[in-house]
Amino acid sequence: MAAHLSYGRVNLNVLREAVRRELREFLDKCAGSKAIVWDEYLTGPFGLIAQYSLLKEHEVEKMFTLKGNRLPAADVKNIIFFVRPRLELMDIIAENVLSEDRRGPTRDFHILFVPRRSLLCEQRLKDLGVLGSFIHREEYSLDLIPFDGDLLSMESEGAFKECYLEGDQTSLYHAAKGLMTLQALYGTIPQIFGKGECARQVANMMIRMKREFTGSQNSIFPVFDNLLLLDRNVDLLTPLATQLTYEGLIDEIYGIQNSYVKLPPEKFAPKKQGDGGKDLPTEAKKLQLNSAEELYAEIRDKNFNAVGSVLSKKAKIISAAFEERHNAKTVGEIKQFVSQLPHMQAARGSLANHTSIAELIKDVTTSEDFFDKLTVEQEFMSGIDTDKVNNYIEDCIAQKHSLIKVLRLVCLQSVCNSGLKQKVLDYYKREILQTYGYEHILTLHNLEKAGLLKPQTGGRNNYPTIRKTLRLWMDDVNEQNPTDISYVYSGYAPLSVRLAQLLSRPGWRSIEEVLRILPGPHFEERQPLPTGLQKKRQPGENRVTLIFFLGGVTFAEIAALRFLSQLEDGGTEYVIATTKLMNGTSWIEALMEKPF
């Protein structure tokens, strides 16, 4: 059991156990010793549902990364390829299988497609003459992976680009399938709300799948009351801004991958007296970040400016607890102290780690450049000087700062102005291409197609109306003891989360005008429940809403939703699902065309 998945109103361990069971069943079909050949991208997500110990129990003796040419030598009966359905991976698999055949003792080959089998891929294997070599060709529907007690992700890195640039609906189909799996485990979700073109398509697919699913009527009492499907392009602004929560900043600066972060090792080296700092570790410090760690659960969603005081308070509590040993006089007292020692030592280690991380972040956030960048972002979001060329952006280009940093700022300005005046847009494009290279013209084209960097049409800026109606900018933010979701960006309230908040109370009818300005349709559907499964809510019992971000979600948005879940009179608790956990940098990166 993973305890951090079962603390919320919805026990996500049920989902984790279901996908683990499916994995065990597949491994047992391949009787005998096994080697797994991994599509490298899958190792992180798989690590969240099955550690090596589980694989070992089912006779997995070796694991390799999928690479061209020959497979490394392994004295096993079965070789299983775990791969995404990508054509380029089929070519590598064929190379592996063909070179293996020529090498002597025959082995059994199997292939597990994650999350779906693909006719195109199987045809490619057939064309390459190896399809017949596979005894088992199956799919493993790992659509939604539980990351935390209230968080699920498909970890589909290309979903936004596929949906909004390429018109490819594969990830939407996987999202609908994932929702079907959830409903099989947690009951039918009676009410569906949505905003955006992709949201509409996912709802349609899911309703169609439900109609076609002629199996026995789902008799599980519904855990979720509502499903809210939200397109990322309804709120393009939020991921572009710098997140200011503790977890958000860790992700902005170091990048969190599948719950792990890699950090500079020197901050974590034990300080020894008089060794002058020699023999410092050179390998990055890798830490897992989730709510299984008490301290992290407490500080992850706080504004970074509120983290220091929590850490110093914790330090006093921990040192006071260690001092207690001097007061232990009787055998019973000493035994009690010793029994608490492992927990205290873990708490001290956790505090040391997070103090080091906070120092690393502070080095960045107290720099002059961070302050200048944040000032410009906040001016844009509050509607100041969004319609002319910005001096700071000009300076960044002139000094050849990171291209992604420049693109995030230019896109933010464009979104906060409902597009840029043509001459401002042309100027930025020209400066970017001259400084960073003309090969980036394809990237600029992608950003325009995605609606991130575009000319203002009809000469009208709708952002001020949206900002005022949805109260997206709050001047008096309390970062220490927040009263509003805007604390996650020190003033800006994420548009996506404000939509969720308003849906919960007083309902979207109050903001019809703004919903019409934002892209895509908004809709409501009901899924009928069999008699006897209708929920009678107890007085004071909160509704549970599953909010699904199609195209990605940031840690700051997750923090804002957790804040709403914890409000005394909030009325709604949120479970968050997404196609990908992302930040502005990884988002822009996914839209960049790699120069040839």
Curated annotation (Swiss-Prot):
GO CC terms: autophagosome; clathrin-coated vesicle; CORVET complex; early endosome; endosome membrane; HOPS complex; late endosome; late endosome membrane
Pfam families per UniProt: Sec1 (PF00995)
Signal peptide: none
A GO BP annotation: lysosome localization
Membrane topology: Peripheral membrane protein
Top-level taxon in the UniProt lineage: Eukaryota
Main location, first listed in the record: cytoplasm
Localisation: Cytoplasmic vesicle; Late endosome membrane; Lysosome membrane; Early endosome
Outcome of substituting residue 498 to W: In MPSPS; may induce lysosome hyperacidification; does not affect the interaction with VPS16 and STX17; does not affect intracellular trafficking, lipid trafficking, nor cathepsin D processing
Stated consequence of mutating residue 441 to K: Disrupts interaction with VPS16. Disrupts interaction with VPS18 and impairs endosome-lysosome fusion. Disrupts interaction with VPS18 and impairs endosome-lysosome fusion
This protein's UniProt keywords: Autophagy, Cytoplasmic vesicle, Disease variant, Endosome, Lysosome, Membrane, Mucopolysaccharidosis, Protein transport, Transport
Presence of the UniProt keyword GTP-binding in the record: no
The keyword Transferase belongs to this UniProt entry's keyword annotation: no
Role description: Plays a role in vesicle-mediated protein trafficking to lysosomal compartments including the endocytic membrane transport and autophagic pathways. Believed to act as a core component of the putative HOPS and CORVET endosomal tethering complexes which are proposed to be involved in the Rab5-to-Rab7 endosome conversion probably implicating MON1A/B, and via binding SNAREs and SNARE complexes to mediate tethering and docking events during SNARE-mediated membrane fusion.
Subunit structure: Core component of at least two putative endosomal tethering complexes, the homotypic fusion and vacuole protein sorting (HOPS) complex and the class C core vacuole/endosome tethering (CORVET) complex. Their common core is composed of the class C Vps proteins VPS11, VPS16, VPS18 and VPS33A, which in HOPS further associates with VPS39 and VPS41 and in CORVET with VPS8 and TGFBRAP1. Interacts with RAB5C. Interacts with UVRAG, STX17, MON1A and MON1B. Interacts with VIPAS39; however, this interaction is debated. Associates with adaptor protein complex 3 (AP-3) and clathrin. Interacts with PLEKHM1.
Record-stated family: Belongs to the STXBP/unc-18/SEC1 family.
Record's disease association: Mucopolysaccharidosis-plus syndrome: A form of mucopolysaccharidosis, a group of lysosomal storage diseases characterized by defective degradation of glycosaminoglycans, resulting in their excessive accumulation and secretion. The diseases are progressive and often display a wide spectrum of clinical severity. MPSPS is an autosomal recessive form characterized by coarse facial features, dysostosis multiplex, hepatosplenomegaly, respiratory difficulties, intellectual disability, developmental delay, pyramidal signs, severe chronic anemia, renal involvement and cardiac defects.
Entry protein name: Vacuolar protein sorting-associated protein 33A
